[in-house]
Curated annotation (Swiss-Prot):
Main location: plastid
Keyword match Isomerase: no
Classification via InterPro entries: Cyt_b6/f_cplx_su6
Name of encoding gene: petL
Lineage of the organism: Eukaryota, Viridiplantae, Streptophyta, Embryophyta, Tracheophyta
Protein name: Cytochrome b6-f complex subunit 6
Segments passing through the bilayer: 4-24
Species for this entry: Cucumis sativus (Cucumber)
Subunit structure: The 4 large subunits of the cytochrome b6-f complex are cytochrome b6, subunit IV (17 kDa polypeptide, PetD), cytochrome f and the Rieske protein, while the 4 small subunits are PetG, PetL, PetM and PetN. The complex functions as a dimer.
Membrane-topology annotation of the record: Single-pass membrane protein
Amino acid sequence: MLTITSYFGFLLAVLTITSALFIGLNKIRLI
């Protein structure tokens, strides 16, 4: 149970970082 929770948290963190980087790149391209 603990491993599933930690894995889900890790996956969520990776998704957040990836989306943040993607938005940042899009903003740089728009400028």
